[in-house]
């Protein structure tokens, strides 16, 4: 048999084999390209919609680089690093049996340390605090990757700095009697009866509270008072409570004149009544939040605070006498209408009414640096779609 004849036989054999092969679809081909397929799925699953979430949520390796979260703070808490420069501390126990001398492995032990710590949790936990949890400076409490619920007593941040609280569900908080409580590396100190706040921030700075869910407390869900400043509350979900977010506690607390606070990308819904926020003295940017009905009012204040409401969505309650977004208190109408309460690209729905006052303030360099660029109110449903505690899994975008 000649070489030419052999080549013809080989050609026809290969052609026949090719024809007998099943036709593969694009999906079949992707079986042989797992890396491309996984990438496509990861991108589809990633739903980071605002400037803070885009900084970290689409990174599948977030669990191996948790402290990168500290680079994502925006607003007036920008630069807050929490426990970034310290060790990662894993909470292994949900117990709170000894508040004066907590055992190693508990959240209370970690929170009281004088050194920077990035605190994470070994597993899902419901931590029933027997007294308020006093958090020391330079701490991050990071609940990503597990479900962490704190109940019965809340968190106290008093005269501290550089705190990040992230992805924690705090609810059903009661007034606690006080007593000897561990607050640092030294001996326990005598603490008075707590107010029953979910989170109480007093005299503290560089505080970032992000992706937390807060509900059902005896007093306020979140109080920020007594000269606290450079605070950002972002991506949180507030539900089922009367007094939600207080920025300045009293008209005689003049130290709050320097307060700078950002309220951004939060969801206020499901039977919230008022103080979202309630402001005194300071300078406040309230930007791209979702207000899904309220009981008495949404934003209020006294003592001439500056409130810049930018790109929020206000969906008013059905009650015709509750359509006003704002509540000005503590002085006559003429004086309160001189306060700088401004609205810019807010979306007013279901008859919501926003009555602005004053004029657009001239911002200081520090105020300019802390402003988050606002998107129009029409974008708020997207921007706040992941507000509250996230369900994160290691090895995948959060």
Swiss-Prot record:
Cofactor binding: number and manner: Binds 1 Ca(2+) ion.
SMART domains on file: Amb_all
SUPFAM superfamilies assigned to the protein according to its UniProt record, in alphabetical order: Pectin lyase-like
Span of the signal peptide: 1-25
EC number(s) reported in the record: 4.2.2.2
Binding site for Ca(2+): 195, 219, 223
This protein's pathway: Glycan metabolism; pectin degradation; 2-dehydro-3-deoxy-D-gluconate from pectin: step 2/5
Subunit structure: Monomer.
Disulfide cross-links: 55-72
Organism: Ambrosia artemisiifolia (Common ragweed)
Record family assignment: Belongs to the polysaccharide lyase 1 family. Amb a subfamily.
Catalysed reactions, as listed in the record: Eliminative cleavage of (1->4)-alpha-D-galacturonan to give oligosaccharides with 4-deoxy-alpha-D-galact-4-enuronosyl groups at their non-reducing ends
This protein's name: Pectate lyase 1
Glycosylation sites: 37
Tissues in which the UniProt entry reports expression: Pollen and flowers.
Keyword presence, Disulfide bond: yes
